[in-house]
């Protein structure tokens, strides 16, 4: 099936933040409970070992992505830190993720462009369910930026460019209607955009189908990385990993410098970055969490 770039509604700057946040909250809820990225934990763990780092910079984090379930799995092999970022940061969702992870998940409240990550944001970069949003030129820029700044990068996509994946997307409006009452924190705007004016179910379906049509397959990922491998000490791994009983595989791309010491030399700079940016999380603990969260309640 041919790849189409197309346009997703969630990417548009004119979309109200309340709608975008409702979308990312739903996606994060479903990701947490279905755990589609559990199969790639060994690959990600191996990449972290190759780069000799336990610091992750998650790009295009949406509502915090899969990290509430992935972090405990990765934490078993050693302490680590995760910094959530996005071009349109869902700060309330980031605060909630930080609270539920006891501060392990930190965030940047300002916009971060995945194609040009600030120099002081250092760590192994990850993109979950977001790489397909970018055109080939933008996707190349994301990978090139990681290569130029000598940072490892991992791309993971649970969507698939196939007839089966598109057919499964037609179930999503029903899932939105069923699970929205269970999504926390409660927002009146989420009920408005889901049940009164059903924008969220429509956008989840529309963007889901478009996401499938935009998803890069392994061959296309190899084309994107081909020239980046020329003349650089950078290693790429591309493949698919299927979970037991899962209808579709997860497509992944891993890239990292072969000279890991070039990353190690900047870890002190990363610590400074986390100390400076983590003010956001301390505000979450002192103000946001007690009013809105109860750990004894359902997580999501």
Locate each region found by the language model.
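A short, conserved alpha-helix within the catalytic core of class I
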Residues: 134-149
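Conserved beta-strand signature within the Rossmann-like core of class I S-adenosyl-L-methionine
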Residues: 150-161
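Conserved Class I S-adenosyl-L-methionine
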Residues: 3-4, 207, 211-265
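Intrinsic-disorder-associated, low-complexity terminal segments enriched in Asp/Asn/His/Tyr and depleted
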Residues: 280, 292-294
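A conserved beta-strand element that flanks and buttresses the S-adenosyl-L-methionine
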Residues: 125-126
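Class I SAM-dependent methyltransferase SAM/SAH-binding core
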Residues: 57-116
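C-terminal alpha-helical "lid/dimerization" subdomain adjacent to the S-adenosyl-L-methionine
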Residues: 166-225, 238
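Class I SAM-dependent methyltransferase Rossmann-like catalytic core
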Residues: 1-53
